UniProtKB/Swiss-Prot annotation:
Its EC number is 6.3.5.-. The lineage of its organism: Bacteria, Bacillati, Actinomycetota, Actinomycetes, Mycobacteriales. This is Aspartyl/glutamyl-tRNA(Asn/Gln) amidotransferase subunit C. It holds the Pfam family GatC. Heterotrimer of A, B and C subunits. The gene is gatC. It catalyses: L-glutamyl-tRNA(Gln) + L-glutamine + ATP + H2O = L-glutaminyl-tRNA(Gln) + L-glutamate + ADP + phosphate + H(+); L-aspartyl-tRNA(Asn) + L-glutamine + ATP + H2O = L-asparaginyl-tRNA(Asn) + L-glutamate + ADP + phosphate + 2 H(+). The keyword Protein biosynthesis applies.
Amino acid sequence: MSQISRDEVAHLARLARLALTEDELDGFAGQLDAILGHVSQIQSVDVTGVEPTDNPLKDVNVTRPDTVQPCLTQDEALAAAPKAADGRFAVPRILGEPE
């Protein structure tokens, strides 16, 4: 039984702002359906009596010394930007646009 439809893949693609062809929609629907099938199989495993684990490597807050290092100036950083305005990176507006 299919768990994800072609329309759901198209909806996800719109949300992610991906332009997919008809063939890609069909292909991804099958791939995502297979992935969900594997996840379902893993979820069905009986883990009664198995102790929960997290990260077996107990490294906590491994940090480097907080030292001042040379970095780009604002002008140098903005020089590499496709568009800048008022000393900031200018990017296309995305909030408030339809899905």
